[in-house]
């Protein structure tokens, strides 16, 4: 039976809903779990398959998705924001203050959050290193290019550094901090870094790792484990709805103050271009009055858009990398949506 308001939601967002359903109908993704909300009214769907290789398994409600880079904004950004509110960290602090192994004194915490740090560099045999070796390589084998403060260049290294900075401040791994400071207070009981395989939606089938299920698809997160602030989180549609409402309606149930949440919806770079960045989030602009809407995606096929001013949001969870990550059709369809 439909809840009050669902019919109206279905009518109002019919083109968006049709586009999301087409992802499964056209075989672009094996399955999809999505939700649209407008104030207190929600519309959600779960359809398709969790797995199609080596066997077919129907998608079930409450299955946990590998969120990939949504980990950054759901977990790491709030931890850093809480540290800033507590006076343990400043946006203007140089990265080097907390990570002295990193030898360039110019990039700041704000640069990391907005992907304007210019930090880059190739790490040979990256996926074959141990966690300790990989962390050391990221701290000592990166350099800062000419894009510092001049260009937004999205890079995981920024959030690896933020995770390690939080670890320096609190003496705990970033993933344990996310658990204690964000997930536990918000009662996000279906969100975890260590899901049971049977409850999780599979991602890629790889020659080296076989069917990836219940462990992070991201190779850095797979190696670094609890010390990874850029990926590794698993969650459900229900928990992401809980998080989304909390962020735009109650400042994450009071975990963040008004000023801090304002910064999440404000351009922090003032760099000309198609898209700007707030603290962690990509900014889109409403068609009618150009107010800021926040958005973030994950490589595995996840996507979150939130409009605080209109109290609206969309959560899209797919495993578009199953059975292979070579799936440009999904990226094209997502951009059209």
Regions of interest found by a model, annotated:
Residues 44, 106-292:
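Short, surface-exposed loop or secondary-structure junction motifs
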Residues 20-58, 114, 126-130, 280-282, ...:
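A short, well-structured edge-of-sheet supersecondary motif
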Residues 20-21, 34, 40, 63-91, ...:
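Active-site SXXK
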């Amino acid at each position: 039976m439909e809840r009050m308001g669902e019919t109206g939601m279905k009518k109002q967002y019919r083109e968006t809903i049709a586009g999301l359903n087409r992802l499964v109908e056209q075989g672009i993704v094996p399955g999809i779990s999505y939700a649209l909300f407008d104030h207190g009214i929600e519309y959600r769907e779960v359809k398709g398959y969790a797995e199609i290789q080596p066997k077919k398994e129907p998608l079930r409600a409450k299955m946990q998705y590998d969120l990939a880079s949504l980990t950054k904004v759901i977990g790491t950004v709030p931890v850093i924001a809480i540290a800033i509110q507590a006076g343990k960290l400043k946006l203007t602090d140089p990265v080097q203050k907390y990570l002295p192994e990193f030898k360039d004194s110019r990039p700041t915490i704000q640069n990391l959050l907005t992907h304007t740090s210019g930090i880059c560099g190739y790490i040979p045999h990256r996926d074959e290193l141990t966690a300790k070796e990989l962390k050391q390589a990221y701290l000592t084998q990166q350099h800062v290019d000419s894009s510092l403060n001049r260009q937004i260049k999205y890079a995981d290294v920024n959030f690896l550094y933020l995770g390690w900075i939080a670890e320096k401040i609190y003496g705990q791994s970033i993933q344990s901090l996310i658990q204690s400071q964000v997930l536990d207070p918000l009662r996000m009981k279906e969100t975890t870094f260590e899901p049971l395989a049977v409850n999780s939606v599979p991602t890629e089938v790889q020659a080296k790792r076989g069917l990836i299920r219940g462990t992070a698809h991201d190779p850095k997160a797979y190696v670094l484990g609890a010390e990874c602030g850029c990926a590794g989180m698993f969650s459900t549609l229900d928990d992401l709805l809980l998080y989304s409402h909390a962020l735009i309606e109650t400042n994450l149930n009071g975990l963040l103050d008004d000023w801090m949440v304002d910064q999440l919806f404000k351009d922090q770079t003032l760099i000309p271009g198609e898209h700007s960045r707030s603290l962690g989030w990509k900014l889109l602009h409403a068609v009618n009055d150009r107010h800021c809407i926040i958005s973030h995606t994950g490589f595995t096929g996840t996507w979150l858009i939130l409009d605080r001013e209109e109290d609206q949001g969309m959560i899209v969870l797919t495993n578009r990398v199953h059975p292979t990550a070579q799936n440009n059709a999904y990226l094209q369809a997502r951009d059209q949506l």
